[in-house]
Amino acid sequence: MTQVTICGGGNLGHALAGWLAARKGLRVNVLLSGQERVSHWETGIAHQNGIMVIAPEETRCGRPELVTADPAKAVRGTRIILLALPAFLHQATLAKVAPFVDTGALVGAIPAHGGFQWSAERAFKGMATKPVIFGFRKSPWTCRVVTYGHSVRITGVRTSMEVSAEPTATVHETAEEISHLFDIALAPLPHFLHVTLSIGNQILHPGILYGRLRDWDGIPFAEAPLAYQGLSDVAAGILHNLSDESQAIGEAVVLKLPRLHLSPIRSLAEEMRTSAQALIEDASTLQTIIGTNRGLFGLRIPSMQVQGGWIPDSKSRYLAEDVPFGLCVLRGIAEIAGVTTPWIDEVLNWAQMQLGACYLRDGTMSGPDVKRSGAPQAFGLSTLSQLMHR
């Protein structure tokens, strides 16, 4: 019997708990952040003897063995620990579970952007425990909670995935072991920087908000603005520029660290086209890829209702996660690799003003809030050699 512990009770946490608990040979624990959440889960599970997972091809109901807010109870004896959490919760969660992790256990994040490998290194530094750290490049599912602690719906399923691991010599056996959990082919990546440098939400969300709101006059909107539909030429151009600079960062790392055998970094358009091909009506440009993706129809910029209408929520994950644990990571690597990024700088300067934070100061990643980000500078990393080695 293999014990798996899931850290997190959001959309992905629900899906993992129900899906994996329904599999034979797995004992599934769930670690939540407080007793109130535990009580909600226990009530929902008791109602139908598990967490209901409604997927396109089938419905499963799996009952976790244990739902708890106690990291010791959740983690002791666990073979595989899965963090299904926003990147800004990785460091705190790793610090809580680290004292109870067995040597040789697998500790990973889904997905593992935002400097996860550096957070894990910090959490286990100086400990006798030496786990294998792994990370998915993407999430295996698109999912949404139907009823908290009770049911979740999977709306999209990936047929293949990529995973990285440290020590790097363990990546093939790690990929093979993890693939059995999901019945999905897992391609091993030769280094964690493949995951860290992958283009996605870290430029999409801040770029969308900057393109939509940089000239906003502060007057509330009648309704929360659409995030993706009706994207202007200017906003699409900003995203294209951010994508180009992100690729340039990857190319510089590939050139300067040839031993890593990093694959070329795909553009934002290529990433979105690949991940949602069946949903896109017109894949000719980045603007049409975003605007005709049926999976994005109707999605709005996270907003708050105020007197007179709606205003954008600067505390939403579009900024609160994708800037410190997304854009800052790219900008930090760019600084180390010697790549200039005028568009990333422009968007980052605007975004940090919305957040009331300072990461980029006088053109360098030296602001006081860098220490609360996933940028390599937050971990004392200042050379490409340090990025390469755990």
Task: Give names to the regions the model predicted.
Residues 185, 193-328, 337:
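C-terminal substrate-binding/catalytic lobe of Rossmann-fold NAD(P)-dependent dehydrogenases
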Residues 140-251, 373-389:
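Substrate/ligand-engaging "lid" and interaction regions
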Residues 8, 32, 85, 111, ...:
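Short beta-strand/turn micro-motifs composed of small residues
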Residues 289-390:
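Long, positively charged, glycine-interspersed low-complexity recognition regions
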Residues 1-54:
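NAD(P)+-binding Rossmann beta1-loop-alpha1 motif at the extreme N-terminus of oxidoreductases
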